């Protein structure tokens, strides 16, 4: 099935994977590239998606945060093998408003909030006990009080410029459709060789 708008097709596939995928279907590989052209990739979780793009949250002091600050162009991959499908997205990062980041942060578990405050993500952890002690101290300090969102922890939206849908076929005759953004609301569609 092909749709005029790739977000509509993404929604159809996403609903299919939600029904058939036992593990977290929101897991997506995020690939970034530093200013010196060294790529890196890791799994992050999709928290929202819409016509505007694909949202995740992160510590901007982490390696991925630093690379995004240097180069806002990224790729995402959803590998949904259980339904023999994959979605690949290329786009540019835009930062969510502090209010949007605050709203999502408030929905996280208290432990996740405290961990986000205490973790120096991607830095060398020389003494794990010190980290655990800091978590315990902060837990006591904020007992019965809201845990403030650290300014470096924020939401990011990948605004898609290209979305490719891949579906497995017999004898490796796979189906691939590539949508390329032509303007704010328009897309061109081509089929690619497998």
Curated annotation (Swiss-Prot):
EC number: 1.4.3.5
Keyword tags: Flavoprotein, FMN, Oxidoreductase, Pyridoxine biosynthesis
Keyword Oxidoreductase: yes
InterPro entries: Pyridox_Oxase (IPR000659), Pyridox_Oxase_CS (IPR019740), Pyridox_Oxase_N (IPR011576), Pyridoxamine_oxidase_dimer_C (IPR019576), Split_barrel_FMN-bd (IPR012349)
NCBIfam families: pdxH, PRK05679.1
Protein origin, superkingdom: Bacteria
Cofactor note: Binds 1 FMN per subunit.
Positions with a binding annotation for substrate: 47, 104, 108, 112, 172-174
Sequence similarity: Belongs to the pyridoxamine 5'-phosphate oxidase family.
Record's keyword annotation contains Protease: no
GO molecular function, one term: pyridoxamine phosphate oxidase activity
Named cofactor requirement(s): FMN
The protein's annotated pathway: Cofactor metabolism; pyridoxal 5'-phosphate salvage; pyridoxal 5'-phosphate from pyridoxamine 5'-phosphate: step 1/1; Cofactor metabolism; pyridoxal 5'-phosphate salvage; pyridoxal 5'-phosphate from pyridoxine 5'-phosphate: step 1/1
UniProt-listed Pfam families: PNP_phzG_C, PNPOx_N
Summary of the function given for this chain in its UniProt record: Catalyzes the oxidation of either pyridoxine 5'-phosphate (PNP) or pyridoxamine 5'-phosphate (PMP) into pyridoxal 5'-phosphate (PLP).
Protein name: Pyridoxine/pyridoxamine 5'-phosphate oxidase
Catalytic activity: pyridoxamine 5'-phosphate + O2 + H2O = pyridoxal 5'-phosphate + H2O2 + NH4(+); pyridoxine 5'-phosphate + O2 = pyridoxal 5'-phosphate + H2O2
Biological processes annotated in GO: pyridoxine biosynthetic process
